[in-house]
Amino acid sequence: MKALFLIGLLALVASTAFAQYSEVVGSYDVAGGGGAQQCPVETKLNSCRNYLLDRCSTMKDFPVTWRWWKWWKGGCQELLGECCSRLGQMPPQCRCNIIQGSIQGDLGGIFGFQRDRASKVIQEAKNLPPRCNQGPPCNIPGTIGYYW
């Protein structure tokens, strides 16, 4: 049982360390009042994604002590801070699409979330910009486009 726990813990740490990188691939134009704005097509805001999906442990928070309840909550605050910082670097008209794209792949498919869990994540995603003091809530569709 201990071996299984250690393997699971190592897998969590490895996946968290791997998921801490962001990548921008291409862009598309968003028509605006003064001309077109460039928005990233595929921006992986892993800090926002991990925060919204309650994947809050980070390598910096790996416990030196076995008091897991102390480092787990700190990881959530750290991820939220990094998420807000990265959202602040995005053009305001692109933020909601980027937030939606960050979680969309995790909400559907054969191994997707249960409906109530997905609804909670979507609601959190909608409220992420105001939580970061970066504008009004997003208009992300509730269950449209997801597989149940």
UniProtKB/Swiss-Prot annotation:
Disulphide bond pairs: none
Propeptide segments, given as residue ranges: 20-28, 147-148
Signal peptide stretch: 1-19
Compartments in which it is found: Membrane; Secreted, Extracellular space
Post-translational modification: Five disulfide bonds are present.
One of the Pfam families matching this protein, by short name: Tryp_alpha_amyl
Top-level taxon of origin: Eukaryota
Expression by tissue: Endosperm and aleurone layer of developing kernels. In the aleurone layer, mainly localized to starch granules and the surface of the plasma membrane, forming a uniform layer, also abundant in the intercellular space. In the endosperm, mainly localized to starch granules and the plasma membrane, but less abundant in the intercellular space. Not found in roots or coleoptiles.
GO biological process, one term: defense response to bacterium
Keywords assigned: Antibiotic, Antimicrobial, Disulfide bond, Membrane, Plant defense, Secreted, Signal, Toxin
Protein role: Acts as a membranotoxin, probably through its antibacterial and antifungal activities, contributing to the defense mechanism of the plant against predators. Forms monovalent cation-selective ion channels in membranes. Has antibacterial activity against the Gram-positive bacteria S.aureus and C.michiganensis, and the Gram-negative bacteria E.coli, P.syringae pv phaseoli, A.tumefaciens and E.carotovora subsp carotovora. Acts synergistically with PINB against bacteria. Contributes to grain texture and hardness.
Protein name: Puroindoline-A
Source species of the chain: Triticum aestivum (Wheat)
Gene this chain is encoded by: PINA
